[in-house]
Structures are given as C-alpha cells and as structure tokens.
Regions:
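Amphipathic alpha-helical segments of tetratricopeptide repeats
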Residues: 13-20, 51-61, 92-103, 137-148, ...
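Short coil/turn linker motifs that delimit alpha-helical repeat modules in TPR/alpha-solenoid proteins
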Residues: 23-26, 45, 62-64, 83, ...
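Non-membrane alpha-helical segments in proteins
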Residues: 1-2, 27-42, 69-80, 118
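Residue at a conserved register position within TPR or TPR-like alpha-solenoid repeats
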Residues: 39-40, 78, 116, 123, ...
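Structural motif corresponding to the intra-repeat A-B loop/turn of tetratricopeptide repeats
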Residues: 3, 42-43, 74, 81, ...
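Helix-turn-helix repeat elements of alpha-solenoid scaffolds
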Residues: 2-15, 40-55, 83-97, 127-137, ...
C-alpha cells in the first residue's frame, strides 16, 4: 500500500480471492478492506467504499487490529471527500484505542505512527502548520524512542516544510538532510528526488 501501486494490489487481491475457500472472519474482513481501497482509488467509487467500510466496522470488534486498520482507512477517506468532522472524530477515537494497545508489537506501533503521520498531513492541508509540526515532532520522538525508521523520513520532511514558517534556514535544512540520509539508506528514490528539490529551493532563498 505504501507505494500506491493499486494495479498490483488489485492483482494480488484477485489471486487471494480465487484461491481462498475457507477463510476466518478476520481474513475475510481483511480482503474486504483491501477491496475498498481498490474501489476508492482505482475506480473512484468513493461513496461506495466509505459505505462498505462503515458496514465492516459495525461487524468487527473494536479490540481487533483489523478494526484499527479499517477505521484509519475510513478516516483517510473522510478527509479526502471533505468530511472533516467525521475525520477528526475518528482520529480521536483511534488515539483512544491505541492508548489501550501494546506498542511493543510492531504492527500496532506502525499503525499508531501511521495514524499520527496522517493527522499531521491533514493539519498541513488545513494550513495549521504549527500544530502539524508539533504532531510530527512528537511522532518523530516516538520513532526514535522505539528505534524505528518507519515513516521517519516523511515526518522529517513534513517538519522541514512546516518549519519554513517558524524555523531558521539551517534548522529546516537539517531536517531535510536527515530525511535524505534515511532515503539513501532505505533506497527510496522518489522521496529522495523530492527532498533534493526542497533543498534546492531552500538554497535559492
């Protein structure tokens, strides 16, 4: 999902559906969740996908990991169709749920980081740069405490972008440079290219 390649995702989804005869409820729910992502982004069936996710949530226990995944995706869909109040309510609910989880489990930790990164990104879209930067900085601190680089480069870039409003040029540059090093280590050429452009723009100021 991270590289947004929905053609490949749909291909894998179809293979799983064809070969899956006896599935647990969680496995079936997982496949339904994947289908809503394909419908939303690949086929622009936004309202159908949202309705499908809302229906899934009504049938799944809120204590499960798949519930968290579905709720996070539904939140993102809400933000993309302009349902901001619903998005913010879901975000608050997600944070409450994650506070009951054990972040020592990688899947839980990554989900929590993803939710907080998405919220920081949402705040940027609302031009709430100070709040977005604060959210991103707290999440960066969490990544470093937990010794994970998951979403760390995008978070650093987000702070750099927001920081042009509040920080000195060298501070902003340091965030970009740290993100650039991570992209080199983990071979992320697309983000690396974006960061190089941000650095050029910064040097031109």
């Amino acid at each position: 999902l991270d590289d947004r390649n929905y053609d490949d995702l749909e291909y894998l989804y179809k293979i799983e559906v064809e070969r899956s005869t006896f599935l647990t409820l969680e496995d079936r729910t997982y496949l339904e969740w994947i289908k809503t992502i394909i419908d939303f982004y690949q086929y622009e069936l936004q309202f159908e996908a949202i309705s499908h996710l809302e229906n899934i949530l009504s049938k799944v226990a809120s204590t499960t990991l798949i519930y968290l995944k579905v709720l996070n995706t539904l939140s993102n869909f809400y933000s993309l169709v302009g349902r901001e109040e619903d998005y913010e309510a879901n975000y608050s609910h997600l944070i409450e749920l994650y506070q009951t989880k054990n972040l020592d489990h990688q899947e839980v930790l990554f989900g929590y980081i993803r939710v907080r990164y998405n919220y920081a990104h949402y705040l940027v879209s609302k031009e709430k740069y100070n709040e977005a930067m604060q959210e991103a900085l707290e999440t960066i601190e969490l990544c470093k405490e937990r010794q994970t680089s998951y979403q760390l480069a995008p978070l650093l870039v987000l702070v750099g972008n927001c920081g042009t409003q509040f920080l000195g040029k060298e501070q902003v540059k340091n965030y970009y440079l740290e993100a650039r090093e991570l992209c080199k280590i983990y071979n992320n050429p697309l983000m690396l290219m974006k960061i190089e452009n941000y650095l050029k723009e910064l040097d031109a100021v």
